[in-house]
């Protein structure tokens, strides 16, 4: 028996690149997505076999430029977004309204995250800083000492309460690990030879993976700071995510998604949508964002053709 992924449907409604997707830990029938069309969409998942996999239940307006990132609070009631309009916004999803605007970055906000307890917020920006905020939109700390020397492309909290850290990466080719208690640098991870787009922390907080221009996914041990190993790809890595319940890493590179079984470092599946267009690489929609459902059975992927594609894990007898 082996596990494969089948394309189950699409979510159509954005008018710009789908830059990020967040699944709702409390409600398996809704997800939220961010786009270059300056909106967030809350999707109701209907899982229709023939037509769309769901429909836009709510569209959230407020940002005045591309939205680069979105995350959900652990209770699923609030969304946090970051935008090229230099702000973050906290949204009450039931009301469909912004409850807080976070101002302080001097350039585009590229990444946002919630701490495990939802009390702290971190953001990364093209202004080369990382900012820590509370949920009242007060900036508590700006990390500049030992900071990135170029755009901060991604910031993430570790889900591990016993090791409170922030992981960041940037266009300076560096992955940095920060001690959350004092906002001081804990580790620098060097090994990439191109700008970095994304970093993600494993569900148990023991390791992280980074990727970008050099097409390599590097895995790092967050406890001792060592580079564990490298997974090679043949295109720019745009997104990374760990499965919540299997030892899998998903890598979005160029138009493709590769799912790695980290136990044996072998490919489980390679996903590439069949897009009806001339087969030149330039015309293939790029995969920009990835998110697993909480149960690890459904993979949502956002693309540069404004579409979300939905894959489902199925067991096949070989």
Curated annotation (Swiss-Prot):
Is Transcription included in the keywords of this UniProt record?
no
Q: Which SMART domains match?
A: WD40
Annotated Gene Ontology MF terms? protein kinase C binding; protein-macromolecule adaptor activity; ribosome binding; structural constituent of ribosome; translation regulator activity
GO CC aspect terms: autophagosome; cytoplasm; cytosol; cytosolic ribosome; nucleus; ribonucleoprotein complex
Q: Which domain of life is it from?
A: Eukaryota
Does the UniProt entry include the keyword Lipoprotein?
A: no
Coiled-coil annotated spans: none
GO process annotations (BP): cellular response to starvation; cuticle development; cytoplasmic translation; egg-laying behavior; IRES-dependent viral translational initiation; locomotory behavior; mitophagy; muscle cell cellular homeostasis
The record's listing under SUPFAM superfamilies reads:
WD40 repeat-like
Q: Which spans of this chain does UniProt mark as WD repeats?
A: 13-44, 62-92, 104-134, 147-179, 191-221, 232-261, 282-312
InterPro entries reported for this sequence:
G-protein_beta_WD-40_rep, RACK1-like, WD40/YVTN_repeat-like_dom_sf, WD40_repeat_CS, WD40_repeat_dom_sf, WD40_rpt
Subunit comment: Interacts with the 80S ribosome.
Q: What does the UniProt record say this protein does?
A: Involved in the recruitment, assembly and/or regulation of a variety of signaling molecules. Interacts with a wide variety of proteins and plays a role in many cellular processes.
What is this protein identified as?
A: Small ribosomal subunit protein RACK1
Q: Which organism is it from?
A: Drosophila melanogaster (Fruit fly)
